[in-house]
Every structure is written in structure tokens, then in C-alpha cells.
Amino acid sequence: MYAVIKTGGKQYRVAAGEKIKVEQIAAEVGQEIVIDQVLAVGNGAELKVGTPLVSGATVKATVVAHGKHDKVRIFKMRRRKHYQKRQGHRQQFTELQIQAIAA
């Protein structure tokens, strides 16, 4: 069984037992969270698509870790004007272990 969930403005296809990295969630490591924004639920033979959400469907997950992605480097330059600007950014993430999908 799998589900398509929405969290942090992005959509993820998840199944029980998987680990996924999502945008940072305000939860402690080891805490169990419930994601109720389920867009679709499938089990191979059939697919249940919500409009926009599947009513009564939830995904239970445990917070495994918090961290930062690799640095993205931004470089701006204007030719012939001796203007150069360098900037870096590291996006924070939360790693989740999917426990169960209830549809």
C-alpha cells in the first residue's frame, strides 16, 4: 500500500517502512506525527484519489533526524561593471520513518 502526501508545499509518494526527507517540521526526534493531508491512496490494483484530499486517510510517521542539505551556491555578476556577489544557502530538512498508512 502506498499514499501520496502533501507536506511543506511538496508532494511525496510514500509506503510503510520508507524513510523520506521533507521540509523542516517543528517536532522532536523520536516523536510520532500524523499527516492528514493525503492526496491519494493505492494498493497496486486500485487507486483512490481525493478531491483534493482523501477523507479519513492518515499517515503515521516518526521523526528520525533533523539536518541540513548540501550548500547551494549563488553567484551574480554584471559584466564590465566589476560587480560580483556570492551567496550560499543550506535548506533544513526533517527525516521521517513512515510507520503506517490508514485509509
UniProtKB/Swiss-Prot annotation:
Secretion signal, residue range per the UniProt entry: none
GO biological process entries: translation
Gene (UniProt): rplU
This protein's UniProt keywords: Ribonucleoprotein, Ribosomal protein, RNA-binding, rRNA-binding
GO cellular component: cytoplasm; ribonucleoprotein complex; ribosome
Function as written in the Swiss-Prot or TrEMBL entry: This protein binds to 23S rRNA in the presence of protein L20.
PANTHER family: 50S RIBOSOMAL PROTEIN L21, LARGE RIBOSOMAL SUBUNIT PROTEIN BL21M
Oligomeric form and interacting partners: Part of the 50S ribosomal subunit. Contacts protein L20.
Family: Belongs to the bacterial ribosomal protein bL21 family.
Stored Pfam families: Ribosomal_L21p
Protein name listed in UniProt: Large ribosomal subunit protein bL21
Any one GO molecular function term: structural constituent of ribosome
HAMAP family, per database record: Ribosomal_bL21
